[in-house]
Design a protein with these regions (language model features):
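Active/ligand-binding-proximal structured segments within catalytic/core domains
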Residues: 63-72, 179-183
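Residues forming anionic-ligand binding surfaces in small-molecule and nucleic-acid pockets
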Residues: 42-50, 72, 163
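Charged boundary/loop elements
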Residues: 1, 70-83
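Inter-domain linker/hinge segments that demarcate the starts of reverse transcriptase
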Residues: 22-31, 101
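Conserved polymerase palm-domain catalytic core
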Residues: 38, 42, 79-83, 88, ...
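Conserved phosphate-binding loops in nucleotide/dinucleotide-binding enzymes
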Residues: 53-54
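Non-catalytic, polymerase-adjacent accessory regions of viral genome-replication enzymes
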Residues: 1-17
Length: 214
């Protein structure tokens, strides 16, 4: 739960029409426009002993993000690289692994190169992201305004202090995985162009290029 400590069951008594009306009011009802509540920071332990920072929005802000995702996803899916499998509908890590095995067996490929993007979610450039959205055809200024507000939502740390983010998109947000795919889509196509003769599969966060021995 976010800083309001509420979850989906807390609004379960409302009818669908009431939920839609509430979301509409949150986004457009104020003269200042949409203002998401602070995102709650929570550190999740990782197997290597480090922690993964999550940013958990309040329940109504999560619903706003879900609405945005349902608008953006079909537009983006039509323009994403076919080599990308992470955070996409009807695709998964298992699909990427299966494709890798198929290529290894059928195309006389013998090695895999893997690389990772360290701290990706925490370092997304907001201006670059908005430009990439625009180039994908997402050009509704009201929608972009709301997404900017989501990216700039203050982060409430465990000690109660507030941080104003200038980069990054919080892991834990509904639309963060989709925004990540928008940012990395250009890289997906660039990697494919550099290794045209050798196929690749992307399980988001890690790139695997499969090739032949010399």
């Amino acid at each position: 739960a976010g800083i309001d400590r509420k979850n989906i069951t807390d609004i379960g008594s409302k009818s669908p029409d009431e939920v839609v009306e509430k979301v509409r009011f949150i986004v457009t009802g104020s003269k200042h426009g949409y203002r998401p509540k602070s995102v709650r920071r929570k550190d999740i332990p990782k197997p290597n002993g480090k922690t993964r920072p999550l940013g958990i929005p309040c329940i109504w802000d999560r619903l706003v993000q879900q609405c945005i995702k349902q608008i953006l996803e079909p537009i983006c899916e039509a323009k994403f690289s076919n080599n990308s499998y992470g955070f996409r509908p009807n695709r998964s890590v298992e699909h990427a692994i299966n494709r890798t095995y198929t290529m290894l067996q059928r195309m006389n490929l013998h090695y895999v190169i893997e690389f990772d993007i360290k701290g990706f979610f925490d370092n997304v450039n907001h201006s670059k992201l908005i430009k990439q959205m625009w180039s994908l055809g997402i050009q509704d200024k009201r929608l972009i305004f709301v997404i900017r507000r989501i990216l700039k939502a203050t982060i409430k740390m465990p000690d109660g202090s507030l941080i104003e983010p200038h980069k990054g998109t919080p892991q834990g947000g509904i639309i963060s995985p989709l925004l990540a795919n928008i940012v990395l889509n250009e890289l997906d196509f660039w990697v494919a162009s550099q290794w045209e003769e050798n196929p690749m599969a992307v399980s988001r966060g890690k790139y695997r290029i499969i090739g032949k021995t010399e």
